Curated annotation (Swiss-Prot):
Part of the 50S ribosomal subunit. Contacts protein L20. Transmembrane segments: none annotated. It comes from Chlamydia pneumoniae (Chlamydophila pneumoniae). InterPro entries: bL21-like (IPR028909), bL21-like_sf (IPR036164), Ribosomal_bL21 (IPR001787), Ribosomal_bL21_CS (IPR018258). This is Large ribosomal subunit protein bL21. Belongs to the bacterial ribosomal protein bL21 family. Keywords: Ribonucleoprotein, Ribosomal protein, RNA-binding, rRNA-binding. One of its GO terms (cellular component) is ribosome. NCBIfam families: L21. GO terms for biological process: translation. Pfam families: Ribosomal_L21p (PF00829). This protein binds to 23S rRNA in the presence of protein L20.
Length: 106
């Protein structure tokens, strides 16, 4: 089997393999040529052996390459009260960072 890891970033968990392209919540400012390193590795399977952290695995990291900034789908929140002429519409688009997973280090 192909090695994979479970990482945590932005209070979400992602199962990643080398070569995967994922969108994670914006991590602040990242230069266009920068490498992104995820330190919170919860689980690693290297093809033969599984390693489980409690809560994270010490010295394990996942290296990724920055690709671009993207925006998610628009989410619309609408409040309405009948017969009172009260309605509020609010929209939101979450900003994401698109990264390509390069390698998983244990």
């Amino acid at each position: 089997m192909e090695p994979y890891a479970v990482i945590q970033t932005g209070s979400k968990q992602y199962q990643v393999r080398s070569g995967d392209v994922i969108d994670v919540e914006l991590l602040g400012e990242v230069a266009s040529d920068k490498e992104v390193i995820f330190q919170d590795v919860l689980f690693v399977f290297d093809g033969t052996k599984a390693s489980l952290g409690s809560p994270t695995i010490a010295n394990a990291q996942v290296k990724a390459e920055y690709l671009s900034h993207v925006k998610g789908e628009k989410v619309v929140a609408y409040k309405y009260k009948k017969r009172k002429n009260y309605h509020r519409k609010h929209g939101h688009r979450q900003k994401y960072l698109r990264v390509k997973i390069r390698e998983i280090l244990i």
